Amino acid sequence: MRKYIIVPVLLAVVLVMMCHCTSDRKATVPANEYLIQGELANLSDSIVIGLYVDEGNIFNLVARDTLLNGKFSFRDTVSVTKKMLIMSDNKGFPGTWLEVWIAPGEYIEIKGEDKLLKTWEVVSDIPEQAEENRFTACAMAQQKELMQHLAAEYDWQRMMFIDHAGDQEFEKKGWAKIDSIRKLTTPLRQEIWKKELEYMKEAPISKVWIDKLLLYASMMKYETVMPYKEEVKSLYARMPETEKQTDAGQEITAYIYPPSVAGIGDMMVDGELYDVNDSLRHISEFAGRFILLDFWSSGCGPVSRENPLAKPLRTDNPKEIG
């Protein structure tokens, strides 16, 4: 009889100690800061882990840390809940990222046993992280297999463009390998999308849910890759009108129901634009003439090299330029 009493008591003590340790760690985080602590088994101490922030069409590096005794950490001030991305350029890592949410005063713990980022466990008291984890869990088996293939592809790209840069024969061999890998990754991605879209039918409409719908809506133009257009439209119908009026909601609407393409003789869309001399111009000034509108992306390396104005424009106007 005593055996059956002692075991529950021991379990209760262990749980209390675990909760106490977590509370102690959180208590050490000031109200205006966040703390990420990671512990990775089976990885060498030379590996560099990067923390990035998604700023529209570019990932900006926030901090780096080198693995020491299997551990890494990031700490900084933060005023609002936001999503960060963890990546590594080291060999064997997939060319993708792990979504990690941070918030004021929050402690975030990451644990992993390999280089396959999406398989790492992220634990915190942040609601958005809990929802992010539920999305990942939808198709964990497929995620793990996909990470393995992406790691192989990323290693081939590194060999092609760094280790064997300029070697056309090796590049030809590399692209053949990558093409064969992508034949495996495309159906895996589609399986993951299908499972996540299925989950979204019943999931709460959260910030994570909106981010996912925006991602899938943006992919609808690639019909051969993204075969779930009707599912995306159905999920859009779930969105409250208040969400549809937000910036993200309007962007989703434009992807799902794109504006009509202008034809010859149609009225031009006009607006205030500035030329290289910082003079105010209007497209209507060129009525009756052919106009070439060249759209540049500040997040593209070749664009930044070709157009040096792109970088200061983005730096000086971070909110206006995505």
Q: Language-model features: where?
A:
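Bacterial N-terminal signal peptides that target proteins for export
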Residues: M1-P8
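C-terminal motif of bacterial Sec signal peptides marking the signal peptidase cleavage site
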Residues: M17-H20
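A non-transmembrane, solvent-exposed segment enriched in polar/low-complexity residues
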Residues: T22-P187, E191-K194
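Short coil/turn connectors between adjacent alpha-helices in alpha-solenoid helical repeat scaffolds
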Residues: S180-L184, M220-K229
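Amphipathic alpha-helical repeat scaffolds of TPR domains
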Residues: P204-M220, Q250
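N-proximal helix/coil linker or "cap" segments that precede and/or mark the start of modular domains
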Residues: P227-Y274, S284-F286, T315
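Short active-site neighborhood of thiol/selenol oxidoreductases, capturing the structured segment around
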Residues: S279-S304, A310
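Conserved helix-turn-beta segment immediately C-terminal to the redox Cys motif
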Residues: R305-G322
